[in-house]
């Protein structure tokens, strides 16, 4: 699946997107964040406060417990503000 990173998540990881193949046990957005954070220091820094990270699966905003099975694209970004 393609994973995209936006704003400071992208800045901390150092790339805008990548293709990943998480292990079979990674079934939710929350589990994907945990798996990504374990991939190295830059990922750990980007996901150090996972409760503030927002996610979208195939362009639809989702909660951390959303299933990732069948997802083509998952995006991670910080909270947005309006104005």
Language-model regions: role of each:
Residues 1-82:
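Ubiquitin-like/PB1-type beta-grasp interaction modules and other compact soluble beta-rich domains
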């Amino acid at each position: 699946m393609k994973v995209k990173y936006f704003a400071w998540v992208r800045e901390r990881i150092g790339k805008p997107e990548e293709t990943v193949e998480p292990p079979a046990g990674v079934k939710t957005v929350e589990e994907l964040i945990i798996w990504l954070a374990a991939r190295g220091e830059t990922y750990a820094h980007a996901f150090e406060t996972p409760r503030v990270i927002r996610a979208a699966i195939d362009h639809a905003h989702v909660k951390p417990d959303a299933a990732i099975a069948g997802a083509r694209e998952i995006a991670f970004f910080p909270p947005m503000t309006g104005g």
